[in-house]
Curated annotation (Swiss-Prot):
Binding residue positions for GDP-4-dehydro-alpha-D-rhamnose: K26, M27, F28, T29, R219, E329
Subunit note: Homodimer.
Pathways involved: Nucleotide-sugar metabolism; GDP-L-colitose biosynthesis
Protein name per UniProt: GDP-4-keto-6-deoxy-D-mannose 3-dehydratase
Transmembrane regions: 49-69
Signal peptide positions on this chain: none
Active-site residue list: H188
Keyword rRNA-binding: no
Amino acid sequence: MINYPLASSTWDDLEYKAIQSVLDSKMFTMGEYVKQYETQFAKTFGSKYAVMVSSGSTANLLMIAALFFTKKPRLKKGDEIIVPAVSWSTTYYPLQQYGLRVKFVDIDINTLNIDIESLKEAVTDSTKAILTVNLLGNPNNFDEINKIIGGRDIILLEDNCESMGATFNNKCAGTFGLMGTFSSFYSHHIATMEGGCIVTDDEEIYHILLCIRAHGWTRNLPKKNKVTGVKSDDQFEESFKFVLPGYNVRPLEMSGAIGIEQLKKLPRFISVRRKNAEYFLDKFKDHPYLDVQQETGESSWFGFSFIIKKDSGVIRKQLVENLNSAGIECRPIVTGNFLKNTDVLKYFDYTVHNNVDNAEYLDKNGLFVGNHQIELFDEIDYLREVLK
């Protein structure tokens, strides 16, 4: 029996040496390594600015929060934001926490991203923002989304936590909107233990992110900035001046040091993931009872999803038991249909556009297995044998 886990370590001696260099420095809190990582991160993905935080979830939190603190607020309580019905929980929680009215839209059962036709119907004069989610490595069709937005004053945001390294028309996923978020949790494309990042080209947004990442103080702002104007030269006072209701979601310095080494390896990681995907797609084309995710642009293939074909008679519970018995780790597709979580949704101000039939079908008939940054041809052959 072959062991086929959901994820595997992306580290070697370079990451352990990076950790040791931080330990030797005795500077454990956010510092120069994090700054270097942010500079390299922005360069890697083609953004002007990058802000590292403690997780992809806190990246989403700061992305939404920042829109309330611009000189002319980009969003206010009660504004409508459109989201797909399938994503991770912390895509949605900041929307509730900042009092936004959330409109859920169905997904495309093939790409697993927001359904373009449903989005087109859902956008109204009340829509102030669209939060797209690039699911399991697959970028959205941003050409179509931008056509829908047209010249309207609608903010485009991206939760790209599962799709680092994906591209659409040679542009990196996570850089199509005003802001995009990334995750570097263990099972993702790179791993910094815990970690996340926000990218933007907007200087005011960037300065707000720097401020609210660490207590809402001015300490991490440049002398001339878009939050306070010009900082005082009195460091004794300025270092403890608080101007925005922020958080403490700073990353550890060792996460920055690890990230520097991981970014160097990212092109190779993505290349191997795509080769695995090519092999996987060939093995599972025309499968008798399973459909696989349809690629949009150039996916970075976080994992390999399956949707049980309608009228196949196959029951997911039995499929999961078979995979687990064979040593193949599998999971639901993200959270499935998030609208099933009625206990938490009672705290939301939300509506549902028409129906979410595809999200409901995925919720009951979808699952995914892992893709890794190492060759998986033997594991994929084994997977195909188990899923005869």
